[in-house]
Amino acid sequence: AIHAIGRSGNYVGSDPASNSVFAAPSISIKLSALFPRYEHAKRERVLAELAPAVLELAQLARSHGIGYTVDAEESDRLELSLDIIEATFSDPSLDGWEGYGLAVQAYQKRAPYVIDFLADLARRVGRRIPVRLVKGAYWDAEVKRAQVEGLPGYPVFTRKQNTDVSYLATARRMFDHGDALYPMFATHNAQTIAAVQAIAEGRPYEHQKLHGMGDDL
């Protein structure tokens, strides 16, 4: 898929260190789809076997001049995902390339802290991280797991309005870290889009949508 996307837009050979990567197409990968036991109990094996594959895909995306986004997972995999991202994003082979990003889910209560972690990582490594803010895709599973395991609380917000507020609060924090993060907002909600525009105050960012949806917006 990386080869196909890169060749379709003739991005091969483009300057990987330039900001043009933000205007280029991008590809998303799901870590749990690349490894059969993607769970914290297998952390050492995941880091040893999956991290090299994730890095290789990132290097391939860079060679084609396209973006590379790691999709969000369920909350119990968050720390593992951040470990993989930190290990691969920091690799010297990606120096000067700002195409390596990830998705953050606003319905997770830890979203603002994830943003702070990513900003710190970006500053330590010396290049920006594109961050796609989404509302979240695993609500039913997250709530069910918390109930089955008898957890004292839920890792996600259980009311839509709380998620909406979290989305805007997290968006504001992303802009606060504008030197370290490139904000990307994936939503089809017109009110949220208008609010993000107001928060941005002219600072650079982009809106994203699912193919075939939200065209009028």
Regions found by a protein language model. Name each.
Residues 1-217:
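Positively charged, amphipathic and often flexible ligand-engagement surfaces
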